[in-house]
Structure formats: structure tokens, C-alpha cells
């Protein structure tokens, strides 16, 4: 069986070396937006251990001072690769530091907008770019031009806002082209990746899908079987569809009904995945088991642990019942996991590896318990790329663009004890809310929206009768990366319609409120 080929060996790749900047992942995203594949690794990466050669290297920004003890520094072997290099902010200061030139704390720090003056329009990095607005975020600055470099751009506070060593094809810039505040940053990155590095613009989901299907076949082989949990969300659905295309019915999808899913979710998943996409689907009704274990529990972290641990128990039990799909089929050897590239970035960032990569529904324990190997067909992709891939593979548009739904489900949208009656109130209110959002044609403008049931009661009036019933809180946010988020501004008449429907159609609700808290200080979910 041939060894699976990694993606950077199949596409021209720009290597982004991360020095811990909060913007590092955006460099990778921007490059992919113009169809150049980019991969991020920590700045401590040993170049000799890299199994592929990049077309170019970008040194990211970072929160450190290059001259301070313990600050990170790049492997000098990167300069022996013979490929173009671009240093951004800290990355530029690293270039100067290695060159032996001074970097010092600036008398005036630059944070926010600044104007860049292009001093050498003929420089290939600034080709087609006039003076433009950029985003600065640095306290240190160069106090001398490194040997062999020339100034190609300045700002009012920095005589070395852009420097170039033309013969070595090395550039440094003191601003962040990857953020949207930099008006021509994407063009600058494209100048570097495409024009200077010569990277072919072939990265697309159309090209990825066949490549990934073949990679799955090479990894799994002709006989092994694969299991994976599905939830009705876009990540697990796209992953399951890829497995179906690659190995057919040797992939077994398991849907565990934990009693805290959205209204009619199980039926919808069976119809979409099983009937519509032809995926080999096993459905387990474990609602009573989950709700029984949640009885009396109010702490949100305990809810999460109970749901996660119970899921593992149910999944293992169901997996043991799965029979081979044909006489030549082998053992179940692999577990599908919906890891995305942001999860990978979180685990390798120079800020320090996270304790665990986030796992779908807390299935990480299954690997040890069941002696399974992991298969992660989406681990190179950002969320927008997963959605695009889903559409290419014929997954219904409404499913591809579905809002995220937490693994613990409605259990963390019922604040307080989770009971069948409380779940029913929360899911009915949520259904009405989402239905009205879709009717208004604004569903895809909103990153995430949901209703949650608060553990308080409120006085109301229905007809001539006084009521004393529960409160529903509505939440809707807009975000790019879910690290920060703003609350969505609805039309007042829309909120009036939703509130009226929920109070009239959901027994037990007397009041509806709308959450107008941004993230931070609040999180997206209430629990």
C-alpha cells in the first residue's frame, strides 16, 4: 500500500513560520484566498526535518523583542533553502537581528492605522501599489539598515517600514498586510507569493477533493473499515461524504440521539445523510440515558463531562455491533474526526501547544479505548473551505451553511437543570427563532443564532389571567473567526414578531429578551 502523500508535496506551498502573533493564521488565510496553498508551523521548526520544500517563507509577527533573552529565533537553515523570504513586523526585526543590525524600543510605539509611503515603486513586492493605509502593531523598530538592504517603504514614524535585499530575495515590512485594515495587504501578499516566489495558484476545493479521496484510499487500504460520529453539522457531514466517496459502505456513520439535539434533528439527519447522500448511517436513540444522567445537574462543566463521557460509552457499544460490509472487509481500524485547520493551528502555535486539539463531541478517548487510528480528511481546511467543499460534493446548500451547534447541544442552552420539559421549551423557541431568521432572508448574514432558556420566571398577562412563567433569551452574533464577535442588529419589528410567536406558541414562556453583549466580555454561548 503506497504511503499517503501530504498536501504540501502536491501543491506549491508558502511556509508561514509563526512567532506567536495573534494575526499569524490570517497570513495563511489570505494566501489561500488567491489560491496559493499555505501552511503554518512554529518558528522553532527545524528546516532539515521538513518533508517538503516551500516555494517561499513568511516570518510572522510576534509579541516579543528580538533582543530580549529567551526570545524566539528562526532556524538559520531557512536562509539556505534558496527561496524568497518575507519578514512581517517581528519577522522583519528578526532579519535585521540576524544581520547584526540594531533593533531597539521605539520612542513612540505604533499601534493602529498609519500611511505607508512607497519609496521604490519598481520593487516587486510593491508592484502596482501606491501609498496606502496599513495596520501597525509594534513597539520596537530598526535603528539601522541591515547590510545589503535598501529602503523601499517608509511611514511617518518609521524610516524602515519596508526593506529589501534584492539579490537574496529577502523583504521585511514593519506593518501587517494580513489584516483587513491594511487596504492593499492582500495584493502585497499576492505579489510576494505569486510574482516573487512563483507559486502556482492551483489550490482550490475543486482540486482538493479528488486529491483527498485518493489520500483516504491510500491511507485506509482496500479492506479496513472506518467509523465516525455525525451530528448534522457541516464538518461531520462533509467528512462523512468524503469517506463515502473514498471507500463507500466501509465507512460507518453513527448518529447518537442524546436527547438535547435541535427539533426534528434526527429525522433530518437520516433524510439528508442516509437517504440523500447515501451514507451508511446507524442511529442510536439514547435520549433517556443522557437525560437520566443529567437529572439534577446544574453546573455547565459537569453537563459537558456527562454528555462527553456518556457519548463515548454509547459510541463504543454501537461500534461493537457493526458487522463487516462484505466478506473481504477487514477490521474497524480508523476513527473519523472532523479536525479543521484552526484546531491544528491552536495546537502548534508558538504561544504554546494546547493541551488537546478540540475533538468532535469529546471523542478523543475513543482512540485509546478502541485502539483506533485517527483519520482527519479536513485537517488542512478552514471553515469557509469546508463549506465550499461541501457544495462541490453536492451537499444541500442549507446544510452547508448551517450555523454551528455545540457538542453538548441544548443542554448548555437550558441554564440550570436539564429536564425533558425544559429541553422541549428551548428547542421549540429556537426553532421559531431560526425559522423567522430564514424567512427574513438574513440567515447567512448571521454567524450564529440561538435561543436559550433562563433559570428565572417572570410575571406576565395572557388574556385576563396573570402568568408566572419562564424567560427565553435570544442571541445572534456576527464574527469572522469566533475569537471576537458583535451582536447582530435586528430590525425592531423582526424581534417583535419572534417574541410574539414564542410567547404564543411555546407553553411555559412569559417573556423574551435579546442579548446585546459582544465577545469579549461575554462568550457566544451562555454556558
UniProtKB/Swiss-Prot annotation:
Keywords on record: ATP-binding, Cytoplasm, Glutamine amidotransferase, GMP biosynthesis, Ligase, Magnesium, Nucleotide-binding, Purine biosynthesis
Catalytic residues (UniProt): 89 (nucleophile), 176, 178
Essential cofactor(s): Mg(2+)
UniProt binding sites for ATP: 231-237
Top-level class of the enzyme under EC nomenclature: ligase
Gene Ontology MF terms in the entry: ATP binding; GMP synthase (glutamine-hydrolyzing) activity; GMP synthase activity
E.C. number: 6.3.5.2
NCBIfam families: guaA_Cterm, guaA_Nterm, PRK00074.1
Protein name: GMP synthase [glutamine-hydrolyzing]
Single GO BP term: GMP biosynthetic process
Subcellular location: Cytoplasm, Cytosol
Catalytic activity of the protein: XMP + L-glutamine + ATP + H2O = GMP + L-glutamate + AMP + diphosphate + 2 H(+)
Stretches assigned to the GMPS ATP-PPase domain: 203-402
Organism: Yarrowia lipolytica (strain CLIB 122 / E 150) (Yeast)
Function: Catalyzes the conversion of xanthine monophosphate (XMP) to GMP in the presence of glutamine and ATP through an adenyl-XMP intermediate.
Superkingdom, natural source: Eukaryota
Annotated positions binding XMP: 304, 464, 519, 525
Subunit structure comment from the entry: Homodimer.
Pathway: Purine metabolism; GMP biosynthesis; GMP from XMP (L-Gln route): step 1/1
HAMAP family: GMP_synthase (MF_00344)
GO cellular component: cytosol
Disulfide bond positions: none
Annotated Glutamine amidotransferase type-1 domain residues: 13-202
